[in-house]
Amino acid sequence: MEITTKLEFDAGHRIPHHKSSCKNLHGHRYAIEVTIKGEIVVDELNSDFGMVMDFKDAKELIKKTIVEEWDHSFIVYKDDAVVLKFLQSLNDHKTVVFPLVPTAENMALVAMDKLK
C-alpha cells in the first residue's frame, strides 16, 4: 500500500554554467511529494490502525527534515564559489550549501536521502 503527501516551500537557487536564464539567481515555489510504501497497520490497539502511517506524522517528519531547512533559503551548490562567497558575506542569511547542483532532480535525490 502506498500513501502520498505533499508540502510546499519557497527557495532561491541558480544552476551555474546553465545555457539559459537558470544560471541567474532566482527562486521558486517548490512542491515536494513523498510517497510512503508499507503495510496497513492491523493492530486495533495501535493508533495508526487501518493506516500505513498517520499523515500528520509523515508531514511532520518531512517538515522537520526538509521544509524547515530549505524554506526561504538560498540553496547554493558547494562548488559555486562566487555565489557562495557572496552569500557568506551576508549577515543572518539563510543559506543551504548543497552537495549537488540544485536542480529539481538533485533536490529530490537529496530529499530522498535525508528521509531514509
Pin down the residues of each PLM region.
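Charge-rich, low-complexity N-terminal segments
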Residues: 1-116
